């Protein structure tokens, strides 16, 4: 009985590890083309569906690198509903550009331990950025 219980516990621990959120951390966005400011986005499991990855804007910076106090979009999703597709790719999600208020279809790719590629597309026109890991 103990061996069966031990096997079940080991299986459960391995299963949790396999399905654990594969992508997390805080990333610095590229500077905005319109304002020159950038943000720190914290990635993790979405609150609404833990199987998807979301990115929350946790801090905004002005062109000169100073933190923007009481930024109106702080705490909101920038990226949401990303589904894991293979080891390094995510798709099916959305990304919001708060400088113009538009929402785009989005994909992400883990480029290295400290960089991700994020793209937003309308039809077949896409724009991509590389974001660097902060934490």
Q: Where is each model-derived feature located?
A:
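Sec-dependent N-terminal signal peptides
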Residues: 4-14
């Amino acid at each position: 009985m103990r061996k069966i219980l031990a096997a079940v516990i080991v299986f459960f621990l391995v299963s949790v590890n396999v399905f654990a959120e594969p992508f997390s951390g805080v990333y610095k966005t590229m500077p905005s083309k319109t304002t020159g400011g950038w943000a720190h986005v914290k990635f993790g499991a979405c609150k609404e569906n833990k199987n998807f990855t979301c990115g929350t804007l946790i801090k905004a910076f002005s062109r000169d690198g100073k933190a923007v106090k009481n930024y109106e979009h702080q705490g909101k999703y920038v990226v949401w509903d990303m589904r894991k597709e293979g080891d390094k790719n995510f798709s099916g999600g959305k990304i919001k550009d708060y400088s113009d208020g538009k929402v785009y279809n989005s994909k992400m790719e883990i480029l290295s331990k400290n960089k991700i590629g994020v793209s937003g597309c309308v039809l077949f026109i896409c724009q991509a950025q590389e974001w660097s890991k902060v934490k």
